[in-house]
Amino acid sequence: MRVLIALLLLTACGRSITSSERLLMGEVMGASFNANEVRMLEAGFIGMRTRTYPVRPQVTCREKIAPPPSGPTFRTRTAGVVAWQHVLTNPDWTLTNYAAGYPDRINLVAAMYFAHEMTHVWQWQNRAATGYSPFRGLAEHKPGVDPYLFDPNEEINFLEMGASLVEEYICCRTLAPEAARTQRLYDTLAAVMPVQHPTQTPRPVEVLGVHEDADLLGICD
């Protein structure tokens, strides 16, 4: 309990989300998401420990835009933790605006990270339907479990992989709005939130965060 009280005291100093961040999430979650209640706060203790996972198959949009793997495993740190409507960010992942320049410009890495964390906030705000709690969200970070590993060709339960699905949708919607998997992701999200159809969302003129050697052909087919 003392730890939770300390977290709440810390988050009282956090920033609210920007107008462009609100626009980005409004296109995905609409009125089902209350942006006014969200607070972002850098927390030095987030990501202090490293974890090692097997390299993920290069089958998702998220993995295809990243630098190619250099070995059979990779090391990573927790980038953020959500406590109710407060997002505690690893200093290496802290930005003053994760959607700077949006909708004309988007940094996919930043936008996808932000969307992932906002989905956990959304899950809490809609907990009557999702059954979500911050303690359930912490299960993402337990040892030996890669929170981003899923097969995009399998039927996926939103309640189990919701944050990763929204993240993947942002990636596919931006790079391949008319692709088959983009439509499947849209259908999955539309069953639980008022997401805007990918072909109705303006495409940014400038897209950052994509590795220079990434093959975008058929990236979300």
Describe each model-derived feature in a short phrase:
Residues 18-50:
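Post-signal peptide N-terminal segment of mature Sec-exported envelope proteins
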Residues 20, 26, 33, 75, ...:
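Metalloprotease/metallohydrolase-associated module, dominated by Zn2+-dependent proteases
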Residues 56-111, 124:
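Active-site scaffold of zinc-dependent metalloenzymes
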Residues 1-7:
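Sec-dependent signal peptide recognition
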Residues 93-112, 124-155:
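Post-HEXXH active-site segment of zinc metalloproteases
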Residues 118-119, 123:
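Short active-site segment of divalent metal-dependent hydrolases/proteases
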